[in-house]
Amino acid sequence: MYQCSCTSDAFACMKSGFGVQYECFASPFNRNAEVYWSAFVDTDGFFGSQGSFFTTVDLLQDKGGSFYANPPFVEDVMLLMKTKIETMLGWKVPVTFVVVIPFWEDEPCHQWMMDQTTSGRAKHRILAEGHQYIEGNQQKNTKQSPIKHTSKFKASLFLLQNEGGKLLWPDENDEKFSMIWDKFQIA
């Protein structure tokens, strides 16, 4: 089992369009952001991990920021993420999240994101076989370029912002969000 990440092109669009500088679920092998959180701080901390997203991100409560969240596709983890995002969207500082989760319509995390009216917008469904990730087992890759992995199931791409996030990183016509969606598609 390994953890996949978005392509560097998709992350570059997140960074240029919405100022994404934090990655909530990554590893030293698949991170795109300089500041990232991972599950194994005991080993990943040597490579820059800030620890668990669930316990250390609160240090940014006075600063805010723009985050990319692609959690392990496990409902319990996604529910914890939902609770943390919900709390962070209540901060008084600008907060933006670009989130990728499986298209599991009946699961509470997906339902909550679909139901957002005050802090969520620009919801996109990405079809199976219609989006790519970079495989998380790069250490085994003997090629020079990353191995792209085509998803085997549908996923949803969400943009969630509080009022400060909307003011700092506006996207009235969803052009910037659509560019991120485009970068997930198979080239």
Q: Model-found features: residue ranges?
A:
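Class I S-adenosyl-L-methionine
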Residues: M1-A69, F73-A187
